[in-house]
């Protein structure tokens, strides 16, 4: 199965991000309930591996971590794939990410080697977009690229299963781990 460990932003941040992205008139916007900051992604994980990981995650107590949104950007320059918030790589956030990644590897989970880029995805774009959608994204970034939101604290990590479909991914909460 596909799954990931993430932080779920507090409702007041989700509300602000939802209002922000409503100004973008293209792409497939992420539902409010699906907004998250991925700590580590498991492209193919077994239930046995998740059970092993569960034991370790129940013991992680790093304390709450701040999410500080410092801007809006895209992944993919010539052909943007997604629009996301830029989240400051606070030392507490980076420490938590390294701890959960290490816990996953020690549980036998084979993880892709990716650099941690803290972000919250707001919208996804098709592989090919008409020029007018490129222009809309450009205008949106010009107007909103410096969007900021005061740091908010998150005190739990969530384990989410991701099921792909033609309508995009469906997320199902599997477990919650308090970190405070």
Description of each model-found segment:
Residues 1-180:
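Histidine-dependent nucleotide/RNA phosphoesterase domain, centered on the 2H-phosphoesterase fold
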């Amino acid at each position: 199965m596909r799954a990931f460990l993430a932080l779920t932003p507090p409702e007041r941040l989700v509300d602000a991000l939802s209002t922000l992205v409503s100004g973008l008139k293209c792409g497939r916007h992420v539902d409010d309930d699906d907004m998250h900051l991925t700590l580590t992604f498991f492209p193919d994980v077994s239930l046995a591996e998740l059970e092993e990981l569960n034991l370790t995650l129940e013991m992680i107590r790093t304390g709450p971590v701040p999410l500080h949104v410092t801007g809006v950007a895209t992944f993919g320059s010539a052909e943007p794939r997604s629009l996301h918030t830029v989240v400051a790589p606070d030392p507490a956030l980076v420490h938590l990410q390294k701890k959960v990644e290490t816990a996953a590897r020690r549980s036998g989970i084979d993880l892709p080697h990716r650099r941690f880029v803290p972000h919250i995805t707001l919208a996804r774009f098709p592989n090919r977009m008409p020029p007018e959608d490129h222009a809309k994204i450009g205008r949106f970034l010009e107007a909103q690229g410096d969007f900021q939101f005061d740091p908010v604290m998150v005190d739990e990590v969530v384990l989410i299963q991701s099921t792909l479909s033609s309508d995009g991914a469906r997320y199902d909460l599997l477990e919650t781990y308090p970190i405070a």
